Each structure stands twice: as structure tokens, then as C-alpha cells.
Curated annotation (Swiss-Prot):
Organism: Oryctolagus cuniculus
Keywords linked to the UniProt accession: Calcium, Disulfide bond, Extracellular matrix, Glycoprotein, Hydrolase, Metal-binding, Metalloprotease, Protease, Repeat, Secreted, Signal, Zinc, Zymogen
Main location group: secreted
PROSITE patterns registered for this protein in UniProt: CYSTEINE_SWITCH (PS00546), HEMOPEXIN (PS00024), HEMOPEXIN_2 (PS51642), ZINC_PROTEASE (PS00142)
Cofactor note: Binds 4 Ca(2+) ions per subunit. Binds 2 Zn(2+) ions per subunit.
Residues forming the catalytic site: E214
Tree of life domain: Eukaryota
Presence of keyword Acyltransferase: no
Name listed for the protein in its UniProt record: Macrophage metalloelastase
């Protein structure tokens, strides 16, 4: 260590760069060793120039790869880049995929979350990981399935310090995660530094964004030198509402696995486009989706931004080609970016506007008795974390935290929702109010006072 520190000191002095503190030089040495393959031979002082040249080349290599001004000197911008949180996988391979192009020789891949960070709720960890896998399955033919016991292809672990592989974590900051390329044993395994503060938002370190990056490695991708790519080595928060893979990420992963399986051609609509201002207009289902409200009717849906004149009508198949027409119920869990759609005895999950794999599922998996064949309407209450399902003159209540139907249900709609009678066509929640749709009319229902506060036409949202 002292020998290499001496070389770094002499090199910085001879290069004309500003003098560096000893801890900066030690940090730079460690960084170049870990990520750029710096190795300095113990040679006589007379040949030390060779080592200085080698160090300068490694600094230049790092600067070029990370898009810095290539000077070969440990200047301020270079040290700042070195101090950014990053992935623990080296940058030395100048390929979009790992050396030898390791890939999974199958399209159905299992994963298991061995333990959970205490920084986040268990369901939020599972959702972030599932969503990260979905990013890659959307652009490849790969399918991912979570298992809870045994050995999975990709084992996911939260750990601190040394944890049984080649790379001990270094505490908060620095290396935040690493992963291994496809293969047996440790191949594909993905590790997150527990000393980081993991989150589902911009605070701390966003688990979803880091997981997308690390799972790229687990699928065979190496680091990219494109700053817009999720496979760029350093971490930076990206707005989750606008996040998408870069062209470089997609080219890399599709060079290994090809593109996604092709869907059937978009079917023609079964019904003509409905008229928004028809006074007899009835909706099949209504739900919020982010900052919009979606109104479903036959093969179409309108989306509307509240308190805005912006309204648009589209075919359901234009957004989700494999979904059927005639959606009968819908609800959103906004903080999870999840929308559930129902038709007959089946339901589908939409996440970030993407149809999720392994759906549709049976409504009976939610706990409905066998006599329930369809759902008329559904709505999620974000304050209670409960979803209400309406069927004829009855309703059920589902606990979204525990993922189980509450005991003591069904109950009569008229008894517990004063002023609301069966049968309900659609319902959604917006700013403390439920909006119940029955035929061409809707009722505004105050969840605080448990009473109907307004009677409106169903299409009043369209400024008709």
C-alpha cells in the first residue's frame, strides 16, 4: 500500500495537478483497483515511470468511460465521480455484455428474495423487485417467477460488509449493490448493501432503480458508458413516472435474448365509438390512473384530467392489446402504481400502465365464494387501505395490506352506504369522495359524513 501511495504521490506531483490529500489518493487507488484493474508491480525506483504511466492510463480509461474530460489526472471532477454511489461490478469490460457472453439458456427464470431490508415494508420490497424484473421482461421473451423456498436461479440478498462472496460491502455510500452474471451456483445472484437506506421514492437509495441495474447484470449485461442507460455504473435518481430503458439498454439485452414475443394483430372494436355527451351514457367501469380518470365503455375508454378540458378516447386494445373489451370493474392503488381490471370471474393487474405477467387470475383467489361469478364495481380507499367490491345488493371488503378478505362480509350496500342502492355499475374514489355510477347518473358520496352530497349525470366529467 505504501509503495503504491508513493507512486501516486510522485505521479500527481509530476503531472502538475493540485496536491491531493493522502485519503484521496488511497481512495483513488482503491477505486482504480476495484473497477479498472489497476495493478502496480513492485519494481525498482528506476523503473517507477512505467507504473506512473500505467496509473495515468487507468485514470484516462476511467475518465473516458464515464464521460469526463480525459486528462489522466486526479482532478476535482474525477474525484467527485469516484465518490458517487455506484454498482460494485467493474467497468473494465468494454462490451455491452459480460465477458464470454453468459446468458440464461432458458426463458423461464426463477428468483427468490432471501431476506428483506428493514428500511421498507415487505410488500414494497417485493413490488420493487417484481417491477424491476418486469422492465426486462417487457423487452425480451424472458419470464420471471418468484419462489419462496429452495434455490432459485437468481437469489436476492440484503447484507452488510463481508457476506460470503468476492466483494465485501463498504458501508453507506460507495458500492451500493452488485450482481453476478448468469450461471450455476452464485451465477445470477444479486446483493444489496444493507447499510444503504433503501426506499421506494427519491429519498435514500431507490430500490427499484438499483434492482433494474443489478438484474441487468444478472441477465448478462455489463456496464454501459451511456449516461442515459440504466446500466451506467453510478447511481442517480430518475423520476419513476418517466423511467424507461435507454436504447442502449434495449440493444444490449436483445442482443442476448431477442425481442419480446409478438402479440396478435389488434382486433377491431366490437362496438362503434360511444358519444361522450350522450345523456343516456352508461359506463362499464371507472377508475383513477395516476392524475387521470379512465372511463371504460365497451371496447373504448376515455381518459380525463380533472379540472382540465383535456379528454381523449382510445381503444382499450391500443394500450393493452391482450385485454378483452367490456371491462366490468376497476380500481387503482395509487401509491403502488397498480390498477386492477375485472371481467367475468377473471382479473388483470396493470403496473405503470404495463400488463403484468401471470394474469388473468380468478376472482376466487381473492376470497370470493363460488356463487360470485362477476364483480359489478370496485373502489380502493387509500386512508383505510381497503378495497370495496360490489356485487348486486352486497359488498365485500378486502384488506390490501394483508391481502385477505375481511371477516364478516358480505354486507348489504343499502345498510352501510346510506343513499346508495343496488345495482352499482361503477365507482371510483377522488379527493375523499366516492362517485357511484348507476345507469346515466352518478352520486357523489362523502366518505367523512357517510352521505350523498350531489346527484350528477354520469358524463358530467366531460363538461357536457
Amino acid at each position: 500500500m505504501k509503495f503504491l501511495l508513493l507512486i501516486l504521490t510522485l505521479w500527481v506531483t509530476s503531472s502538475g495537478a493540485d496536491p491531493l490529500k493522502e485519503n484521496d489518493m488511497l481512495f483513488a487507488e482503491n477505486y482504480l483497483e476495484n473497477f479498472y484493474g489497476l495493478k502496480v508491480e513492485r519494481i525498482p525506483m528506476t523503473k517507477m515511470k512505467t507504473n506512473r504511466n500505467f496509473i495515468e492510463e487507468k485514470v484516462q480509461e476511467m475518465q473516458q468511460f464515464l464521460g469526463l474530460n480525459v486528462t489522466g489526472q486526479l482532478d476535482t471532477s474525477t474525484l467527485e465521480m469516484m465518490h458517487k454511489p455506484r454498482c460494485g461490478v467493474p467497468d473494465v469490460y468494454h462490451f455491452k455484455t459480460m465477458p464470454g457472453r453468459p446468458v440464461w439458456r432458458k426463458h423461464y427464470i426463477t428468483y427468490r428474495i432471501k431476506n428483506y431490508t428493514p428500511d421498507m415494508k415487505r410488500e414494497d420490497v417485493e413490488y420493487a423487485i417484481q417491477k424491476a424484473f418486469q422492465v426486462w421482461s417487457d423487452v425480451t421473451p424472458l419470464k420471471f417467477r418468484k419462489i419462496t423456498t429452495g434455490k432459485a436461479d437468481i437469489m436476492i440478498l440484503f447484507a452488510s460488509g463481508a457476506h460470503g462472496d468476492y466483494g465485501a460491502f463498504d458501508g453507506r455510500g460507495g458500492v451500493i449493490a452488485h450482481a453476478f452474471g448468469p450461471g450455476p451456483g452464485i451465477g445470477g445472484d444479486t446483493h444489496f448493501d444493507e447499510d444503504e437506506i433503501w426506499s421506494k421514492s427519491y429519498k435514500g437509495t431507490n430500490l427499484f432503480l438499483v434492482a433494474v441495474h443489478e438484474l441487468g447484470h444478472a441477465l448478462g449485461l455489463d456496464h454501459s458508458n451511456d449516461p442515459k442507460a440504466i446500466m451506467f455504473p453510478t447511481y442517480g435518481y430518475i423520476d419513476l413516472n418517466t423511467f424507461h430503458l435507454s436504447a442502449d439498454d434495449i440493444r444490449g439485452i436483445q442482443s442476448l435474448y431477442g425481442g419480446p414475443e409478438q402479440h396478435q394483430p389488434m382486433p377491431k372494436p366490437d362496438n362503434p365509438e360511444p358519444t361522450a355527451c350522450d345523456h343516456n351514457l352508461k359506463f362499464d367501469a371507472v377508475t383513477t390512473v395516476g392524475n387521470k380518470i379512465f372511463f371504460f365503455k365497451d371496447s373504448f375508454f376515455w381518459w380525463k384530467i380533472p379540472k382540465s378540458s383535456t379528454t381523449s378516447v382510445r381503444l382499450i386494445s391500443s394500450l393493452w392489446p391482450t385485454l378483452p373489451s367490456g371491462i366490468e370493474a376497476a380500481y387503482e392503488i395509487g401509491d403502488r402504481h397498480q390498477v386492477f381490471l375485472f371481467k367475468g370471474d377473471k382479473f388483470w393487474l396493470i403496473s405503470h400502465l404495463r400488463l403484468q405477467p401471470n394474469y388473468p387470475k380468478s376472482i376466487h383467489s381473492l376470497g370470493f365464494p363460488d356463487f360470485v361469478k362477476k364483480i359489478d364495481a370496485a373502489v380502493f380507499n387509500p386512508s383505510l387501505r381497503k378495497t370495496y367490491f360490489f356485487v348486486d345488493n352486497l359488498y365485500w371488503r378486502y384488506d390490501e395490506r394483508r391481502e385477505v378478505m375481511d371477516a364478516g362480509y358480505p354486507k348489504l350496500i343499502t345498510k352501510h352506504f346510506p343513499g346508495i342502492g343496488p345495482k352499482i355499475d361503477a365507482v371510483f374514489y377522488f379527493q375523499r369522495y366516492y362517485y357511484f355510477f348507476q345507469g346515466p347518473n352518478q352520486l357523489e358520496y362523502d366518505t367523512f359524513s357517510s352521505r350523498v352530497t350531489k346527484k350528477l349525470k354520469s358524463n358530467s366529467w366531460f363538461d357536457c
